[in-house]
Amino acid sequence: MKKRFFALLLSLSLLLSGCTIYIELPWEDDTQPQTVSGDGLVVHFLDVGQADCALLECDGQAMLIDGGNVDDSQLLVSYLEQQYIDTLTAVICTHAHEDHVGGLPAVLAKYQAETVYAPVTEYSSKVFSDFVKYTGRQGLSVTIPSPGDTFRLGQAQVTFLGPVKQYEDTNNTSLVVKVVYGQTSFLFTGDMEKEAEHDLLDTEPDISADVLKVGHHGSDTSSSYRFLYEVNPTYGVISVGAGNSYGHPHEEVVSRLKDAGIVQLRTDQLGTIKATSDGSEITFWWENQNAAPEDVTPAGERYYVGNKNSKTFHAPTCGSLPAKKNQVLFTDYTEAINQGYTPCRGCLG
């Protein structure tokens, strides 16, 4: 588990007037911090309503992760123009749903990309077909990455972690992308749901990250307790539309994020959110200067609670915890499994 401390000047209340948050991230005592000499990593979480879109810039290179809805096409192209983007090192479509691929055909019609990634090359929708068509017009083919594939965006390392299996549910086919810059890291999961989260965790990758783009717009189909425990982020960015018909983010997810001590930054409240990393510190800025993320209580040591009698183990916030005398604590999910305990279907299912 990553070490954490909140040299974040945390209390947020001291910082909210400027709408900027600073965090410094520690490293293990027996290692030296990885240094970077570039211009920094900037991650723009665009406010595209009930959709996803992130622009990443590092050392003069840029890439997109998802492109919002079709109706966001002009917004996205205009935003790239405002950032003086000329070409894209990579365009990543996490999965084929319209609220992730929608604006990418317009981007590919205007901007040359070096590589275009997606989990599939065919899908039964016009917008995805347009995405493939405009990729082809650049003389490129859509690349389906494998877990472990990496590339560089300036001095940032981009690694594909999933999906680790084949799925019928399109959400679970989402590409899982980790971006590391110096001692800081960001994790993008598209709309990956709990089934794929657990399959990914079973492969024991390093999914720890300082900033998590919360999966599936904060739907309760994603962001399981176990997944949040293993990622152990300080911040969770939720890309979501105000008053959306899905009720995102679901209260269950908001509660789990709070229980985990994760600061929630929501595009429906803050507008476009920008995170800047110099390799050791992350600074946040957001568009709506009259709003601020809710303060949180930093989480203590994280653990699982086992029931000695039923041999079931739970999240510490579960409503079905055994009496104290029947409890056994585990610091790791795998430890509980190895000792013959079964995860609670209610809180860890």
Role assignments for model-derived ranges:
Residues 2-5, 16-300, 320, 326, ...:
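Non-globular, low-confidence helical/coil segments that flank catalytic cores
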Residues 297-311:
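SH3-family beta-barrel domains
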Residues 307-323:
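Short aromatic-glycine-(Arg/Gly/Cys) micro-motifs in beta-strand/loop hairpins
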Residues 348-349:
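Short, solvent-exposed mixed-charge patches
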